[in-house]
Amino acid sequence: SEMCIRDSIKDWPEMVPLTDNLLLKVASVIHDPVTTTDELIPSGETSSYRSNPLGLAEFTLSRKDPEYVGRAKAIQAVEKVREAGECMGKAFPEVKEVMHAIKEKFEDVCGSNTGVGSTIYAVKPGDGSAREQAASCQKVLGGWANIAKEYATKRYRSNLINWGMLPFVIDKDFDFDNDDYVFIPGIKDAVKNKTEVIKAYVVNKDFAEIELRLGELTDDERQIITDGCLINYYKYN
């Protein structure tokens, strides 16, 4: 007999594998000493959405940074155009300028090899309960990474990895702003080859070079990130 699924239960959206390069737009900057999972995705009023990934994601950072969801969705719209094989620049003039600036320095960069998404910068995210939605909600809004000084818990970092997000650590202080564009060339190779220091560039700040690290990752975790998420990892392997 056919399985009956209630309207309140929604599928996970498709998640694409990691691309050769990444262009990340900063969608939230949090300078608090610690950011909790409850701040990343509140409990309580969100519980009725727990079987609706996109519905739940609307509450991401709602108490901490109410503008986050809109910013993340705006850059996710660019990625959807890219995934459809259409011209990002035509649809989004700002991205056209950014990609043009990148191509002047990295000429083999193009839409087919460069994924576009959001990242948050937080000093020490992930304290508190082990709720997986703190990571998955960012992912379904097009999040491709976190950048942090450190991660508050191993569990939050593991959740990022399982949702195919890069748990970057930055040692030196950098003054990130919302809407900064961070370009990471060769990120897929860096993950596969266990590159310790990954060079990235803040495009709109004169290509300021920053150094990112991924820290310890098992071979399986590297494959999960490359495949796009744990769901894909089981599908592909």
PLM feature spans:
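Fe-S-dependent hydro-lyases/dehydratases of central metabolism
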Residues: S1-N237
